[in-house]
Amino acid sequence: MPSPRRTIEGRPLGSSGGSSVPGSPAHGGGGGGSGRFEFQSLLSCRSGADPACARLRASDSPVHRRGSFPLAAACPAQVAPAPPPEDAGMNLNPSFLGIALRSLLAIDLWLSKKLGVCAGESSAWGSVRPLMKLLEISGHGIPWLLGTLYCLLRSDSWAGREVLMNLLFALLLDLLLVAVIKGLVRRRRPAHNQMDMFFTLSVDKYSFPSGHATRAALVSRFILNHLVLAIPLRVLVVLWAFVLGLSRVMLGRHNVTDVAFGFFLGYMQYSIVDYCWLSPLNVPVLFVLWNQQ
């Protein structure tokens, strides 16, 4: 009697695919019992009752064959999702404003370095550096504050005191606004600058905007509007303001944009002072207290 331990095809485990043994199902031998056993095996394979048959059908399925390769199973987990079209457009096409600002900054740094011919004693115009530093002192806030206070104390006319008091107000406003903007922006001074400036404060380590440029524009506009000067003197005042701003770049103290914005800020500061002009009519208490000194 044949052993009931058979494969799915009904062959004995020890038989080869090309040989047949008498009495086996291939030769029709073995009686009806072996035929019924083979028929029941086939039925169990079709119904999925046998776990071995279930594994065989799963291994023959197309899904299992596709997943049997490790690369095919790993690919869906490794491939990152493609970015949305709008995100890719933002990365590849930066805004026009950003490109313009970066280009302006690059030109500003390049031009400031080219114009810094007096930044050190070994620079191209290093011999002119003492003269530039003297011009630097002429635009410093301390000499202007002390000079305005001295003239205010020596003045004996109401009109002169009114002009000088508003000049003092303008200088204090300039110092306050420049200090606030420098503290907010915190732009470092150029790398080729030497920190040998006259009477510096904590905010003076920052360069934007140029306090000398704001003061030069403010004082020049103030003088031209409230002092009667001959034409050569008026030209000299404008020339002083321009050369003072240029000297800030030549000494390496500031970049070109620091000075340009400083001129604009100083020009607008005078508009504020002119709008808030102090006079005996709007602030009589201030002038009365000053006259009692």
Curated annotation (Swiss-Prot):
A Pfam family the protein falls into: PAP2
Free-text function comment from the UniProt entry: Magnesium-independent polyisoprenoid diphosphatase that catalyzes the sequential dephosphorylation of presqualene, farnesyl, geranyl and geranylgeranyl diphosphates. Functions in the innate immune response through the dephosphorylation of presqualene diphosphate which acts as a potent inhibitor of the signaling pathways contributing to polymorphonuclear neutrophils activation. May regulate the biosynthesis of cholesterol and related sterols by dephosphorylating presqualene and farnesyl diphosphate, two key intermediates in this biosynthetic pathway.
Residue numbers on the Cytoplasmic membrane side: 1-132, 184-226, 291-293
SMART domains with a match to the protein in the record: acidPPc
PANTHER family: POLYISOPRENOID DIPHOSPHATE_PHOSPHATE PHOSPHOHYDROLASE PLPP6, SPHINGOSINE-1-PHOSPHATE PHOSPHOHYDROLASE
Native organism taxonomy: Eukaryota, Metazoa, Chordata, Craniata, Vertebrata
Lumenal side: 154-162, 248-269
Transmembrane segments: 133-153, 163-183, 227-247, 270-290
Catalytic reaction list: presqualene diphosphate + H2O = presqualene phosphate + phosphate + H(+); presqualene phosphate + H2O = presqualene alcohol + phosphate; (2E,6E)-farnesyl diphosphate + H2O = (2E,6E)-farnesyl phosphate + phosphate + H(+); (2E,6E)-farnesyl phosphate + H2O = (2E,6E)-farnesol + phosphate
Biased composition (Low complexity): 10-25
One GO-annotated biological process of the protein: positive regulation of neutrophil activation
Assigned EC number: 3.1.3.-, 3.6.1.-, 3.6.1.68
Keyword annotations from UniProtKB, A to Z: Endoplasmic reticulum, Hydrolase, Immunity, Innate immunity, Lipid metabolism, Membrane, Nucleus, Phosphoprotein, Transmembrane, Transmembrane helix
Region annotation (Disordered) ranges: 1-34
UniProt-annotated stretches for the region Phosphatase sequence motif III: 247-258
UniProt record similarity statement: Belongs to the PA-phosphatase related phosphoesterase family.
Subcellular location, record wording: Endoplasmic reticulum membrane; Nucleus envelope; Nucleus inner membrane
Domain of life: Eukaryota
Active site: H212 (proton donors), H254 (nucleophile)
UniProt region (Phosphatase sequence motif I), positions on chain: 182-190
GO molecular function: isoprenoid diphosphate phosphatase activity; lipid phosphatase activity; lysophosphatidic acid phosphatase activity; phosphatidate phosphatase activity; sphingosine-1-phosphate phosphatase activity
Protein name: Polyisoprenoid diphosphate/phosphate phosphohydrolase PLPP6
Region annotated Phosphatase sequence motif II, chain positions: 209-212
